[in-house]
Design a protein with these regions (language model features):
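Intrinsic disorder/low-complexity detector
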Residues: 8-11, 76, 80, 146, ...
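Acidic/histidine-enriched, beta-strand-rich ligand/metal-binding domains
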Residues: 31-32, 39
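N-terminal Lys/Arg-rich, disordered targeting/topogenic segments
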Residues: 1-21
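Catalytic-core environment of secreted peptidases
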Residues: 57-83, 139
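Short linear motifs in intrinsically disordered/low-complexity regions
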Residues: 7-10, 51, 64-65
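The N-terminal extracellular segments of secreted preproproteins, especially immediately downstream
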Residues: 28-31, 68
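Active-site-proximal helix/loop segments of hydrolytic enzymes
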Residues: 16-26, 37-47, 53-60, 92-277
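Glycine- and acidic-residue-enriched helix-capping/strand-helix junction motifs
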Residues: 80-93
Length: 277
């Protein structure tokens, strides 16, 4: 009859799904949980802690003036890579502009790895010259290259590898360099622009910085043999017209020098000067 309900149908309606009150309760729980999570993240960010509750790493640097060595990676009879520009010319221009910025800043004592850009010096010889000056930080400036027809471009840098005395400090400095270059418009290669290099005899193996295992193979000579935190930077591809226009031309080298200078300031915790080049 139309006026009577079927008990079986009523039971089905009661058991067919959660009530509105239950759904609302679940939604409230989800919202509360999400709010608590974001408040926790904000608290960590405000306190400077990471998700494990630990303070983020900061190098212990002491008081200024800080001794910073700049290494032009090629020079003399060693031209480095050739392309749109010659690597040794680009590294010399960048090094000179960076040294000028450091010389103008009383927080720093700039040091050089070679007597002149026309001097030929092996990495082992430069490492010895660097150590003799007792630096607190080393930046080795290089340019990258690729075979003809390759579209390879971008910035990458190589800190002292895991397990070495100055690895954590070097990695921290590498982060400042990569972040600065990205902000300047460079494409970052690899994981965040940071990679490791190992040599197995004459064979070079590139490893992403996510691989943190300690290995016995040596990395770049300068990174292995200097007694301070060190990073080797490949500021752009000398074989890429676009890269060179942005970061390897005369003005591009000045741009990169400024990025490197500000990364050094970030490492030591000083305020960069507005020094024009």
């Amino acid at each position: 009859m139309a006026g009577r309900s079927n008990p079986r149908h009523a039971r089905w309606r009661r058991q067919g799904g959660p009530s509105a009150a239950t759904v609302i309760g679940l939604l409230v729980c989800v919202v509360c949980f999400s709010a608590a999570f974001f408040l926790w993240k904000a608290a960590l960010s405000g306190s400077g802690r990471n998700e494990s509750g630990e303070e983020p790493f900061r190098p212990v640097v002491g008081d200024p003036p800080y001794r910073v060595c700049i290494d032009a990676g090629h020079g003399g009879s060693d031209p480095g890579a050739r392309g749109v520009v010659e690597e040794k010319e680009m590294t010399a221009q960048t090094s000179e502009a960076l040294l000028a910025l450091l010389e103008a800043d009383p927080n720093y004592i700039p040091l050089r790895s070679r007597e002149s850009y026309d001097a030929t010096a092996k990495p082992s010889e430069r490492a010895g010259a660097i150590n003799a000056q007792i630096p607190q930080l080393l930046l080795s400036i290089h340019g990258n290259s690729a075979p003809e027809g390759s579209a390879a471009a971008g910035f990458e840098c190589y800190p002292s590898v895991p397990g070495r005395t100055w690895h954590r400090e070097s990695y921290y400095f590498a982060q400042q360099l990569a972040q600065g270059m990205q902000a300047a418009g460079a494409k970052l290669r690899g994981h965040g622009g940071i990679r490791y290099i190992y040599y197995q005899g004459e064979v070079k193996q590139l490893v992403e910085s996510t691989h943190t295992e300690v290995r016995d193979e040596r990395s770049f000579t300068l990174l292995e043999d200097v007694n301070c935190p060190a990073v080797l930077a490949e500021q752009c591809f000398v074989t890429s017209e676009e890269d060179v226009a942005q970061f390897g031309s005369e003005e591009g080298c000045k741009t990169v020098a400024r990025v490197y200078y500000e990364a050094i300031c970030a490492y030591f915790g000083t305020q960069p000067l507005d020094t024009p080049l």
